[in-house]
């Protein structure tokens, strides 16, 4: 799950950092 999430974030690019923070907060 984590790898898939990171891959999706990399594809988005710009909002990856913000999305990663949100993802970490969710877990």
Curated annotation (Swiss-Prot):
<keyword id="KW-0238">DNA-binding</keyword>
<dbReference type="InterPro" id="IPR036388">
    <property type="entry name" value="WH-like_DNA-bd_sf"/>
</dbReference>
<dbReference type="GO" id="GO:0000786">
    <property type="term" value="C:nucleosome"/>
</dbReference>
<keyword id="KW-0539">Nucleus</keyword>
<protein>
    <recommendedName>
        <fullName>Histone H1.3, embryonic</fullName>
    </recommendedName>
</protein>
<comment type="similarity">
    <text>Belongs to the histone H1/H5 family.</text>
</comment>
<feature type="domain" description="H15">
    <location>
        <begin position="1"/>
        <end position="27"/>
    </location>
</feature>
<dbReference type="Pfam" id="PF00538">
    <property type="entry name" value="Linker_histone"/>
</dbReference>
<dbReference type="GO" id="GO:0006334">
    <property type="term" value="P:nucleosome assembly"/>
</dbReference>
<comment type="function">
    <text>Histones H1 are necessary for the condensation of nucleosome chains into higher-order structures.</text>
</comment>
<keyword id="KW-0158">Chromosome</keyword>
<dbReference type="GO" id="GO:0005634">
    <property type="term" value="C:nucleus"/>
</dbReference>
<dbReference type="InterPro" id="IPR036390">
    <property type="entry name" value="WH_DNA-bd_sf"/>
</dbReference>
<dbReference type="GO" id="GO:0003677">
    <property type="term" value="F:DNA binding"/>
</dbReference>
<dbReference type="InterPro" id="IPR005818">
    <property type="entry name" value="Histone_H1/H5_H15"/>
</dbReference>
């Amino acid at each position: 799950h984590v790898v898939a999430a990171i891959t999706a974030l990399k594809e988005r690019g710009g909002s990856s950092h913000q999305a990663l923070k949100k993802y970490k907060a969710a877990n």
